[in-house]
Structures are given as C-alpha cells and as structure tokens.
Amino acid sequence: MHSKRYSLTEGSIWKAMLFFAFPVFLGNVFQQLYNTFDAWCVGNYIGDDALAAVSSSGSLIFMMVSFFNGVAMGAGVVIARSFGAKQYDTMNKAIHTAIAFGLVTGVMLTVAGVALTPTILRWMGTPAEVLPQSIAYFRYYFCGAIFTVMYNIFVGILHAVGDSKHPLYYLIFSAFVNIVLDMLFVAVLGFGVGSAAIATTISQGVSALLCLLHLVRVDAPYRVSIRKIRLDKTSLVEIIRYGLPSGVQNSVIALANVVVQANINSFGKAAMAGCGSYSKLEGFAFLPVTCFTQALSTFVGQNLGAHRHDRVKKGVGFGIACSCIMAELIGVLSYLFAPQLISLFSDSQESIAFGTQHMRTICLFYCLLAFSHCIAGIMRGAGKATVPMFTMLACWCLFRVTYISVAVKLVNQLTTVSWAYPITWTLSSIIFLIYFLKADWIHNFDRDFKQA
C-alpha cells in the first residue's frame, strides 16, 4: 500500500512539507513554461497582434475555469481529511463523486466557453485588430476545457493523499508535448494563433489521461474503479460544502481581474502585449505561492483529520515563512530585470515600456500575495473555506473594482490600474492575519468533523 508513504501526519514536519511542495513547485514550473511558450512562440513567429491575443487570455480563462477548480478544492479537503483519519470508505466515495462531478461540469464549461467567447471578449473591450485572433485562440482552448477540469480533479485527488510526484512526471511529459506541437504548428507549418491553443488542448488531454491511468492502476486505498464513478449524495454535499465557497471566490475574483484587463485594453494593443507578457512571467512568481498553498492545505487537512494539532501549529508557520521569503526574492529579481524579461516576448519598445512599468509597480508586494494565499490554503484545509471567500471577495473583488472605477477616472494612467493589486493584497493580508491569530480554527475543525 502507498498510503503510508504519502501521509503528511508522521515524521519531520519540514521534510514532509518540502517533499510534498517541491514536486508541486517543479510541476508548476513546467506548466508555466508551456503556457509561456505559447506567448513566446506566437509573439516571435506571428507578431504583436497575436501576442496581444494570447497574452490577454489569463483573466478570461481563469474566470471560466476557476469556479470548477474551486469546487475541486472542496473534494481535496474531504479526501485529505478522510485519508488522515484513515476513513477509506468515505474517501473512496468522495474520489469517485469528484470524478463524476468533473465530467459533468467539464462538458458544461466546454459548451459555455465556446459559445460565450466572442461576447466576453467584446465586453472586455478587446481592440478590433486583435479580436479575430483572440476569438480563434479562446474557442480552440475551450474545446479542451473538459481536459483541464479533469486534470485538476485528478491532481487534487493525488495531492490530497500526499502524492505530488506522479502529477509532476505527467506534467513534464505534457509540457514537452506542448512545446513540440507549438513549434510544429506555429513555427514550421504556420497554422496561426489558433494552433497554439490546439497544442495546449492536446497536451492537457495527455496529462489528464496519464493521471487517470495511474489512479486506475495504483495499489492504494484511493484507487479508482471506472465502474464506481457516480455521484454519491452525501459525498457531493460535503464536496460542495467545502468547494462552493472557493469556486464562488475564484470566479468573482476572476471577474474583477477581467475588469482590470478591460482597463488595460483601453490603453491599446501595446499595453495589452506588454502587460500580457508580464502576466506570463507573473506565473513564475506565483510558483512558491501556489506550491506552499497546496502543501499547507493538504498538510492541515490530513493532520487535523488525524487530530495532530501540534503538527498543524508548527507546520503552518514553516510553510508561510518559506512561501513569503521565496515570493519576495522573486519579486526583487523581477524588479531589477523587468525590461529584459518583458523583451523576451516582444521587441516593441512601447510594449516593453508598458510591461516594465506594470511589473515594477506590482512585483515588490509578492510577499503579501503569498501570505494571503497561504492563510486561505490553511483555512480551506481546516474546512473554513468561507473565511477566504468573504475576505477575498471583499478585498480582491469589491474593493478592487471600486478602486479601478474611481481611480482611473481621476488619474488615467496604466500605473493607476497596476496599483489595484498591491493595495488589495495589503488589505487582505491584514484581515487574514487578524483572523489567523484570533480565531480558534483548529478546534472548530474537530467539531465540524464530528458532525460530518
């Protein structure tokens, strides 16, 4: 059995955390590499219009996918809790319910994404000269949305039981597939911007299939049986209970970021290309944030399920410190080398200037972003998903949109838009710190667990 090997409830805390987080970090590196390679490839082989079309994709894709990924987080909480408590029957039902739910919602997302892409892009104020290529890219991308949803479901299952290595192997292989197909479709065959999305769709399908094959074949309590894939009412209620707040949070925040992107679009395609190039680089800055957030959520869920309160208290401090220090180090390096980094995607001096300005306004505040995400991950692992939901909705959505709506009218500059991120990260960090220090979230988990 592999269950003991992947348990985070025993042994050295820092080793358990790092051994889980490091493969997640490497996996995210490769995922970000092939996302970035799309932008690099179309920017260098097609041109700035294509780069603008692809680079503005982040906020729209995140808006469409984030709700379903948030609900998948709920499945991870239920699975990690049951795994830590060694309640394998409950865990097994949750796993198969999560897969069934992912299949249903993945189809819904694919249909909605293909149908709504033109409307959303026009609402975002996408310039007319970029719009056709943007529509082509997004429609091809959303044709494979079901693969994205299922991959996240499978990875969520593996992470919940402490296995972060196998997703890494599959992501490395799919990243290689994506890069090869990008070069073939765009650079060699000259198929256009849509082919970059097709390459991404194929690679996501490959990674989802590899994860499924592993789950079907693994000799462990979390083994998947195709015949058992169905919606179990009790498991679904638990998954939605923990996942719906994260899904709503992700979607509404993504909508707020679409508003930010729409304001960036108003400065023209050079601003779109420059800021879009930054958004690809920003993904690398988020790597320590995302890997430690996932590690903390799984660590807290497993150890609270096993009633290891002492490990929880020690582990969260270590995880937060590592994430914040690494994020800020990346932020400082990003500030120092901003022009050189942006120029990797475009040789347009105007685009480089916009991207550099945007990056340098934001990047020194990455430690606050890391802190907010870590506390959110801890609260999700503790079954308190409504805490990050309300905090982030208030700070990253309502306040961010209000700030943008007012500030841009007063000072119509790109830096005004850029400041929306540091200001709202600061606000959420203050609220999270107060809750983290004052609330009895550890023992509340025990009471909720007994009721479940």
Predicted feature descriptions by range:
Residues D48-S59, F138, A197, K269-F284, ...:
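Small-residue hotspots at the loop-to-helix junctions and early N-terminal turns
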